[in-house]
Structure formats: structure tokens, C-alpha cells
Curated annotation (Swiss-Prot):
Gene name of the record: GDH3
Gene3D superfamilies in alphabetical order: 2.40.50.100
GO biological process, one term: glycine decarboxylation via glycine cleavage system
Regulation of its activity: Inhibited by harpin, S-nitrosoglutathione (GSNO), nitric oxide, N-ethylmaleimide and 5,5'-dithiobis-(2-nitrobenzoic acid).
InterPro entries: 2-oxoA_DH_lipoyl-BS, Biotin_lipoyl, GCV_H, GCV_H/Fam206, GCV_H_sub, Single_hybrid_motif
Cofactor binding note of this UniProt entry: Binds 1 lipoyl cofactor covalently.
Origin species: Arabidopsis thaliana
Name assigned to this protein: Glycine cleavage system H protein 3, mitochondrial
Amino acid sequence: MALRMWASSTANALKLSSSASKSHLLPAFSISRCFSSVLEGLKYANSHEWVKHEGSVATIGITDHAQDHLGEVVFVELPEANSSVSKEKSFGAVESVKATSEILSPISGEVIEVNTKLTESPGLINSSPYEDGWMIKVKPSSPAELEALMGPKEYTKFCEEEDAAH
């Protein structure tokens, strides 16, 4: 019993979380420093979007850090399928109880799928930013743009420095 309590308090202090329910989608554990989760296997933009590249498809959403700063998301505006997105250009908006923010595309390409669940349940961005709260799936037009994005360690450091400056 004492060991279980110690393990639980240690996990809480380190902000370790298990994603056993969807282990086929994400790494078994993610480490959260201070404020939000940053996952291995994803790329990150300095505008706080993430990209998961699998084969010829890149899934895009906003990071846990971004949704945490936005607060409760109440409305999402997304592009239509078969439209194009351009790197560092707006493809939609997220309205929260705090503000409305444009969402910038971290890469260029053709939108092949839009997460229509967000129309009825925009809060999925808060509860599951890396799984159920994804926004669009894109066929990338420039693989070099993916390589230019930050990895998890770089993004964590970027967020820490950005938060320290504010």
C-alpha cells in the first residue's frame, strides 16, 4: 500500500500519464514539464500546432500547451476538404472563453479530411488535443517543411522559454 501511494505521488509530481487505452496511436508514456504534454513522434511549430506524419498523410492539431492557454474551446472553424493550406498561413480559428485565435498551418498541402466531430464537440480539443481533437489531415506538398519543424525536446524548451518571458 505504501509503495502504491509513493508511486502515485511520484507519477503526479513528474506529471507522468499513461495512454494505455489508445496505445496503438501514441507512445506508452509522455512526460509533462510544468504545464502540458509534449509527445514523442510528433513535430511542432512555434505557433503551437503539432503534426503527425504517417505515410503520405499529415494530421494537424493544436498542442496541449496551446489549448491550456486558450481555456475552454467553444467553437472551431476549419477549412473544407479538397482545399489547400499554406505554411504559416491561417486555415481556421478556435474560439475559447478567453479569446479567438487563428490556427496556422505548419506545412503546405491539400486538405484531405476535416475532423467534423469538432463542430458538435469543440471541447475535444481540450480533453484530447493529440487524439480526438485533431483538426485536419493534409497531403503535404513539401517534405522539407516537415523536417524544419521542432521535435519534442526542442518544443518543450521553446514553451518553457516563451512562458518565462511572459
